[in-house]
């Protein structure tokens, strides 16, 4: 977090004196009116709760480098999102993936809204907890992962298989989208 903008009312709720709770120790804080925060957020069609944070863009790793650095790691689980482009949906998936200890999410670089403030807001702080691998071609990436002993599982509403009965040991890729 680089900068925090908040209203005078939210200032009262912020405890900056307790070092154990002081997560904003080295962060610049500016006090604004609710209207100023509304104006700041309206251009991106965002809402706020009397607090707006300006964050540094998180540099994401490269998939092949990640695989090379973890050659002996077992039970890696990755998620591929194919043609999932809505920032709210992607943010929600990032939150879920972080809660299930997914190692990373693979997305097509041309259709991933990496600079979307709505994506960051929808991810609710989980962008920093999960690797996002941007790739140029999903099919080539799947072939590469298969060559590195990953099992790829696609999901279909009409399938008669129950994924909860599947043995998820080993390296897995969960494919969502079209």
Question: Which stretches of residues belong to each language-model region?
Answer:
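N-terminal positively charged helical leader segments and presequences
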Residues: 1-68
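Short, glycine-rich nucleotide/cofactor-binding loops
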Residues: 78-88, 108
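Histidine/lysine/aspartate-rich catalytic loop segments that bind and position anionic ligands
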Residues: 103-161
